[in-house]
């Protein structure tokens, strides 16, 4: 088993990565015999993993309830959050309960926010089942639900007690969802680690074949990089903003197209190339480096162009609601080379429009 620690003083927590963790009682630390937990998942995953995880927890002596939610980004909402609160209250869960988020980014974000709010804060465990959640959203304490006017606009920073990553989940992941997760994987190479980017260029086929050794290394490296950034900048006042490469454009795509029509990673991939084209237009990034980014995203099965029919002017209203906007000024994460990125403020809207146009189908 690989184990990484997110170092945040008394709120530090472990990330465990291995095959077969769902059958191991110790993988769901810090739950102990006699404690109460609410296991939350979606309708799709319930058929695959709810029973084995519940059996493992019950074998450990944990009293387990369950909530099964509808599957999809459109259900990451306040109304679904209320369903979780109702289930907790109706089943007499107190401040000593633990929420177990068994699912991808939607379940993890929503249940993390539920944990932050319920009785002013209860413990929760992230059990990510998609590559995207395993390498990104389950680590770092960002929790939220969506609003019709913007993605992740209602949320909190609230760290899990632990993260349990069983790579066997990826065997049942649709290829499109796997590719979506690879967008976040590639992002780490672009913004932080040129050696990892080069490794991805040589190992992409192995990842797409779900070779266990490649998956474990990939997930571990991403979690190491994320843990390092979160330890330095938990609340996104500085360096952590770099993890949002492609997200300002990507969130605009998701909001405009309707949540769930473009997967998050697909929107981030197209947004990453839009950010790269902005950087090229401003002279911060060499065009051949942008082409390497585009080539790797394409090999992963990801789009490098925006949605057909979404004109450049449709992006800006959404982008100006981005959480990185300060004083009405657009701030963008732009790659400056493979392995490095910076936040730039005051980028001309005309340059942004032109870069988006460069990436239209």
UniProtKB/Swiss-Prot annotation:
GO BP annotations listed: amino acid biosynthetic process; aromatic amino acid family biosynthetic process; chorismate biosynthetic process
Cofactor note (record): Binds 1 divalent metal cation per subunit. Can use either Co(2+) or Zn(2+).
Reactions catalysed according to its record: 7-phospho-2-dehydro-3-deoxy-D-arabino-heptonate = 3-dehydroquinate + phosphate
InterPro entries noted in UniProt: Dehydroquinate_synthase, DHQ_synth_AroB, DHQ_synth_fam, DHQS/DOIS_N, DHQS_C
Cofactors required: Co(2+); Zn(2+); NAD(+)
GO-annotated cellular components: cytoplasm
Molecular function as annotated in GO: 3-dehydroquinate synthase activity; metal ion binding; nucleotide binding
Positions with a binding annotation for Zn(2+): 184, 247, 264
Pfam families xrefs: DHQ_synthase (PF01761), DHQS_C (PF24621)
Subcellular location: Cytoplasm
Main localization of the protein described in the UniProt heading: cytoplasm
Highest taxon of source: Bacteria
Alphabetical UniProt keywords: Amino-acid biosynthesis, Aromatic amino acid biosynthesis, Cobalt, Cytoplasm, Lyase, Metal-binding, NAD, Nucleotide-binding, Zinc
Residues that hold NAD(+) according to the record: 71-76, 105-109, 129-130, 142, 151, 169-172
Pathway entry: Metabolic intermediate biosynthesis; chorismate biosynthesis; chorismate from D-erythrose 4-phosphate and phosphoenolpyruvate: step 2/7
EC number: 4.2.3.4
NCBIfam families the record matches: aroB
Entries under HAMAP family matching the protein: DHQ_synthase
Protein purpose: Catalyzes the conversion of 3-deoxy-D-arabino-heptulosonate 7-phosphate (DAHP) to dehydroquinate (DHQ).
Entry's family note: Belongs to the sugar phosphate cyclases superfamily. Dehydroquinate synthase family.
Protein name: 3-dehydroquinate synthase
Organism: Edwardsiella ictaluri (strain 93-146)
């Amino acid at each position: 088993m690989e184990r990484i620690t997110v170092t945040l003083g008394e709120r530090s927590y472990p990330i465990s990565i291995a095959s077969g963790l769902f059958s191991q009682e110790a993988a769901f630390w810090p739950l102990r015999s006699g404690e109460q937990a609410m296991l939350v998942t979606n309708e799709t995953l319930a058929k695959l993993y709810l029973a084995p995880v519940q059996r493992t927890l019950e074998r450990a002596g944990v009293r387990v309830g369950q909530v099964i939610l509808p599957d999809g980004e459109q259900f990451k909402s306040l109304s679904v959050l209320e369903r979780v609160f109702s289930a907790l209250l109706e089943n007499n869960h107190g401040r000593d309960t633990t929420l177990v988020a068994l699912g991808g980014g939607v379940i993890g974000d929503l249940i993390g926010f539920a944990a932050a709010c319920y009785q002013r804060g209860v413990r929760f465990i992230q059990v990510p089942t998609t590559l995207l959640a395993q390498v990104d959203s389950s680590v770092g304490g960002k929790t939220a639900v969506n609003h019709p006017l913007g993605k992740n606009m209602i949320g909190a920073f609230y760290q899990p007690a632990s993260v349990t990553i069983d790579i066997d989940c990826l065997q049942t992941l649709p290829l499109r969802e796997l590719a979506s997760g690879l967008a976040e994987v590639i992002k780490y190479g672009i913004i932080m680690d040129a050696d990892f980017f080069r490794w991805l260029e040589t190992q992409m086929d192995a990842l797409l074949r779900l070779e266990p050794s490649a998956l474990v290394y990939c997930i571990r490296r991403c979690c190491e990089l994320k843990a390092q950034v979160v330890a330095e900048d938990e609340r996104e006042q500085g360096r952590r903003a770099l993890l949002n490469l492609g997200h300002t454009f990507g969130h605009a795509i998701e909001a405009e197209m309707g949540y769930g029509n473009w997967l998050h990673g697909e929107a981030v991939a197209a947004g990453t190339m839009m950010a790269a084209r902005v950087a090229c237009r401003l002279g911060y990034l060499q065009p051949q480096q942008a082409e390497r980014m585009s080539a790797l995203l394409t090999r992963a099965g990801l789009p490098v162009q925006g949605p057909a029919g979404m004109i450049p002017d449709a992006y800006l209203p959404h982008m100006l609601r981005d959480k990185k906007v300060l004083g009405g000024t657009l701030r963008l994460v732009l790659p400056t080379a493979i392995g490095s990125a910076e936040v730039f403020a005051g980028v001309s809207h005309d340059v942004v429009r032109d870069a988006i146009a460069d990436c239209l189908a």
